[in-house]
Design a protein with these regions (language model features):
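Primarily recognizes the serine-hydrolase "nucleophile elbow" in alpha/beta-hydrolase
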Residues: 108-180
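Mobile cap/lid helix-loop segments that gate and shape the active-site cleft of serine hydrolases
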Residues: 7-12, 25, 163-200, 206
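N-terminal cap/lid segment of alpha/beta-hydrolase-fold proteins
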Residues: 1-50
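Short amphipathic alpha-helix adjacent to the substrate-entry channel of hydrolases
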Residues: 69-88
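The conserved beta1-alpha1 loop
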Residues: 59-61, 113, 212
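Short beta-strand element of the alpha/beta-hydrolase
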Residues: 50-62
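Short beta-strand/loop motif that positions the catalytic acidic residue
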Residues: 210-212, 216
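C-terminal catalytic histidine-bearing segment of alpha/beta-hydrolase fold enzymes
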Residues: 221, 225-271
Length: 271
């Protein structure tokens, strides 16, 4: 059977560049180097058209001991179809490094992306930082220190790591107050060095949207509430969405209605 059909273009195609090196870390007794990479997913541009799309920088979790920048990217296609670029970012994990090097890596990635904004077709003035669990901790820390240049090292320092909105999912906030079951997750040996996020909260923090599940048995809801309350007390803008009954890294967080709430927040808060 032969058919001729007319297709109406309702959404963009999506493309992925999966091996972009944004920096490097010393390795093997400081005698070698290992690359820091990011994966960049974008709406496919029309022929000859210049892009200037907003960017979501995404940080995977992994108890600060492991990370996979691509593991959540299939769920991020939804945002790419809405006209956003998404950068899944590698950061150092603590069998190789110590606090605050993971935050330094992420802030370097943000500055790198700003420096290459025209090349990649992204808008360096419209960046959302979003991450889950340990990545949510780094998300909050980097979001709160974008203006004061803390942890800015490694290159591209003529750009800031400031972002316009911050969306941590079930973030760790004050690690000293948490009870972790060692049979469920192994935290880094230097966990006591990880700063209390609330110590960085100021009135001029970028807008925050915090997501947390009421049934989270790994990072309790009280951690997300602690960050929300600290932002509210400081006079910064903060929203919080509690997913009833949702566990840690629950599939509930990637349902269309939750993504729609995230998108609504982003579109209201980006300049």
């Amino acid at each position: 059977m032969k058919q001729t059909i007319r297709v109406q273009i309702r959404e963009p195609g999506v493309i992925l560049a999966g091996e972009i090196v944004y920096g490097q870390r010393r390795a093997w007794g400081n005698l070698s180097y290992r690359p820091l990479k990011l994966s960049l997913m974008r709406p496919r541009p029309s022929s000859g058209a210049a892009q200037n799309v907003p960017l979501i920088v995404w940080l995977c979790g992994g108890a600060f001991t492991e990370v996979d920048r691509d593991i959540w990217l299939p769920e991020m296609v939804w945002f790419a179809k809405k006209g956003y670029a998404i950068a899944g970012v590698d950061y150092s994990t603590t069998y190789r490094t110590r606090f605050p090097e993971s935050a330094e890596d992420v802030k370097l990635a943000i500055r790198f992306l700003k420096a290459h904004a025209a090349e990649y077709g992204i808008d360096g003035n419209r960046i959302v930082l979003m991450g889950e669990s340990a990545g949510g901790y780094i998300t909050a820390l980097c979001g709160l220190t974008g203006k004061n240049r803390e942890f800015d090292t490694g290159g591209f320092e003529n750009y800031t790591s400031e972002v316009q909105a911050v969306i941590p999912w079930y973030p760790l906030v004050r690690l000293s107050g948490m009870k972790i079951e060692p049979d469920r997750v192994t935290l880094p040996h230097d966990i006591t060095a990880y700063a209390d996020i609330t110590g960085y909260v100021t009135r001029d923090a970028p807008p925050f949207l915090i997501l947390h599940g009421s049934g989270d048995s790994l990072v309790p809801l009280s951690q997300g509430e602690l960050l929300y309350d600290s932002l509210q007390k400081a006079g910064a803008y903060a929203d919080m969405i509690v997913l009833e009954g949702a566990e840690h890294a629950d599939t509930a967080f990637v349902q269309p209605e939750v993504k729609a709430l995230i998108l609504d927040f982003i579109e209201k808060k980006l300049p």
